[in-house]
């Protein structure tokens, strides 16, 4: 086997004794998510809105990457991206996706799965124009997931977009916008000693009712 600086199997972290009981949970997983998200913010966790996004296209080969949560409500969890990126192409072919948050400081993980839909153009525009100018320009300059012949290509495109738009308002690119993932399942995981973690899964029954189940760790 390849030698590594440290054996991955030897890396162990013993979770604290914080428990999670059924009575601790809100009947609504979105409200429960809000409670945990607020606690993570109060714990000053860096990049608290960073989440893994897993997608798979027609070939069923999964891809995963980190994206940023930009909003959530009863309709789902919102993130923004380039529609022509790998994730955008995969979501067009197969809209089912999964999200995961891991806040190690709180020994907590949240898994969410469901169907993603493109947000309205108005919602995408509102968020796009709230971004720093440099981020707006980069959405035009970067053809996400394209193979580049060096950094200079990207820098040249950025310079071109800067000159093109100047001090004028930067329009929303047609290839850029948001997705909203409406959850079918939401799982809350609380780390416990001896790997006997607490896991609760919400499964959607109707638009506004959920079945809550305790799962073996």
Regions found by a protein language model. Name each.
Residues 1-217:
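Binding-site signature for planar aromatic cofactors or substrates
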